[in-house]
């Protein structure tokens, strides 16, 4: 599950996004120079660095016999897929109206890779177990919280 959005691949996409933000302009200025876009990028960068640290923690935990990394992997899956979707979504926003194009438009940038990957990670969020289900599993199994009560007659 954790390999669905490896942090090093995510950092590579961040670097590609930074390159895109240097090329795309708004009011004659590259988007990387606009505080709102730059702030969103920095938030994503911080999350990726945290994910890389978490991945190293999981790797070192595997070296210690008896260490359970199941919950850590669930957290990695949850945060990894959500983060990739957020990152690809920023790229869509950076491209403006061209970011909304999909499939066979002659105006696509990078053959529509950003749009495809955006939808791919949306599918992983849904298909790999919705984020809410993942959060419930982490809460119940990892934190020992009680299961949600069942409503009678529902």
Model-found features: residue ranges?
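Glycine-rich phosphate/cofactor-binding loops in nucleotide/flavin-utilizing enzymes
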Residues: 1-7, 98-154
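Glycine-rich beta->alpha junctions and the first turn(s) of the following alpha-helix
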Residues: 1-51, 124
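Catalytic-loop motifs flanking and including active-site residues across diverse enzymes
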Residues: 9, 13, 47-50, 76, ...
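Alpha-helix initiation and N-capping motif
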Residues: 14, 34, 55, 88, ...
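C-terminal helix-coil-helix/basic helical segment that borders enzyme active sites and/or dimer interfaces
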Residues: 22, 26, 35, 49-106
């Amino acid at each position: 599950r954790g390999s669905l959005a490896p942090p090093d691949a995510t950092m590579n996409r961040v670097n590609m996004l930074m390159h895109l933000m240097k090329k795309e302009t708004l009011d004659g200025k590259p988007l990387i120079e606009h505080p709102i876009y730059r702030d969103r990028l920095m938030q994503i960068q911080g999350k990726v660095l945290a994910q890389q640290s978490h991945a190293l923690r999981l790797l070192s935990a595997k070296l210690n016999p008896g260490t359970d990394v199941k919950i850590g992997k669930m957290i990695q899956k949850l945060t990894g897929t959500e983060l990739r979707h957020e990152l690809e979504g920023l790229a869509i926003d950076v491209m403006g109206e061209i970011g909304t194009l999909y499939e066979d438009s002659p105006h696509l940038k990078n053959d529509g890779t950003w749009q495809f990957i955006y939808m791919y990670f949306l599918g992983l969020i849904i298909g790999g177990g919705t984020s809410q289900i993942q959060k419930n599993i982490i809460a119940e199994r990892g934190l020992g919280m009680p299961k949600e009560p069942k409503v009678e007659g529902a």
